[in-house]
């Protein structure tokens, strides 16, 4: 390799890293298009989580009506057609849990029936923030975010949790997560999963944990299944099942507690490298 080529490669790497900003803890924002709701920070569990509660009371969710959920890794909006797909689901969905969402997608403006967005970003590249986004009609009672760094890349993988009051006096916890990917021995993977499950120690009655779990080998699948079973969650099965697979293992999952599936489907699409999951749930 010539000295010139080596210097060129180093210059490109330096440029990329100078354009990259890492957020640890995650940069977390609540954006509402309908109301001027503000949140104040507080410590709910431990210092590993950044938590916020609203200045105003949140509206309750009905437990007599089905809860409809879309979960999708949107691949940073790099593929044609993602806007149309989200708009097609908007009318029949109460919550959208998106991974690899970005600030440039302007999701609250696009999805006017989903005016409330929680966005937890692990990094920004050239002023484009990227992370997980939870969109809904409902404002949370409180929310938390956390991240664990990818071992090889050092880029934080984020998760955001939100708690909603139910009309029966109980609470619903929703966790939207994008799990560690680039690691052969799943040390950081376990750490991130422990961080997620820690939140189930709080007083919640119904739980949804969903997202891109990057469970691409048998060891990761077993770690994931054991931890979910430990906390009483069960996995949703899909028909048809068109989830993205690696080594024949699906990467995307939905786990629930205190709810049961009425229907659960996936859709083939070219609007992302992942296919969306949609589920209709009833409270137990």
Q: Where do the protein language model's features map onto the residues?
A:
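Metal-dependent phosphoester-hydrolase catalytic domains
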Residues: 2-55, 200-207, 215-284
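Structured beta-strand-rich core segments of catalytic domains in phosphoester-bond hydrolases
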Residues: 33-56, 95, 99-171, 267-268
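Boundary/entry segment of secreted carbohydrate-active catalytic domains
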Residues: 37-81
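A generic local structural motif
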Residues: 56-57, 81-85, 119, 160, ...
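Active-site beta-strand/loop signature of hydrolases that rely on acidic residues for catalysis
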Residues: 67-74, 84-108, 173-177, 196-221, ...
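Active-site-proximal beta-strand/loop segments in catalytic clefts of secreted hydrolases
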Residues: 72-75, 99-101, 120-123, 136-138, ...
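Soluble catalytic domains of enzymes that build or remodel membrane lipids, polysaccharides, and related
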Residues: 78, 105, 126-128, 132-204, ...
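Short, glycine/charged-enriched secondary-structure capping and boundary segments
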Residues: 83-86, 110-113, 189-190, 222-226, ...
């Amino acid at each position: 390799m010539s000295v010139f080529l080596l210097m060129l490669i180093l210059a490109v790497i330096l440029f990329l890293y100078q354009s990259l900003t890492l957020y640890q803890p995650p940069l977390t924002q609540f954006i509402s298009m309908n109301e001027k709701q503000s949140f104040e920070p507080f410590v709910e569990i431990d210092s590993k989580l950044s938590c916020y509660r609203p200045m105003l009371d949140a509206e309750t969710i009905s437990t007599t009506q089905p809860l409809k959920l879309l979960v999708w890794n949107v691949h940073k909006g790099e593929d044609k057609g993602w806007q149309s797909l989200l708009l097609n689901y908007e009318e029949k969905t109460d919550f959208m849990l998106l991974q690899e969402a970005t600030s440039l997608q302007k999701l609250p403006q696009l999805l006017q029936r989903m005016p409330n967005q929680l966005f937890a970003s692990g990094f920004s590249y050239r002023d484009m923030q990227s992370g997980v986004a939870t969109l809904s009609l409902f404002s949370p009672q409180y929310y938390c975010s956390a991240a664990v760094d990818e071992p090889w890349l050092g880029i934080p993988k984020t998760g955001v949790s939100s708690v909603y009051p139910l009309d029966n006096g109980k609470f619903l916890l929703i966790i939207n997560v994008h799990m560690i990917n680039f690691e052969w021995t799943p040390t950081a993977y376990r750490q991130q999963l422990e961080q997620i499950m820690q939140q189930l120690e709080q007083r919640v009655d119904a739980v949804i944990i969903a997202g891109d779990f990057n469970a691409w080998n048998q060891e990761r699948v077993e770690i994931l299944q054991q931890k979910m079973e430990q906390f009483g969650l069960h996995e949703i099965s899909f028909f048809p099942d068109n989830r993205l697979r690696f080594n024949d293992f699906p990467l995307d999952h939905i786990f629930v507690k205190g709810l049961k599936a009425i229907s659960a489907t996936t859709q083939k699409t070219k609007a992302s490298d992942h296919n969306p999951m949609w589920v209709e749930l009833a409270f137990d």
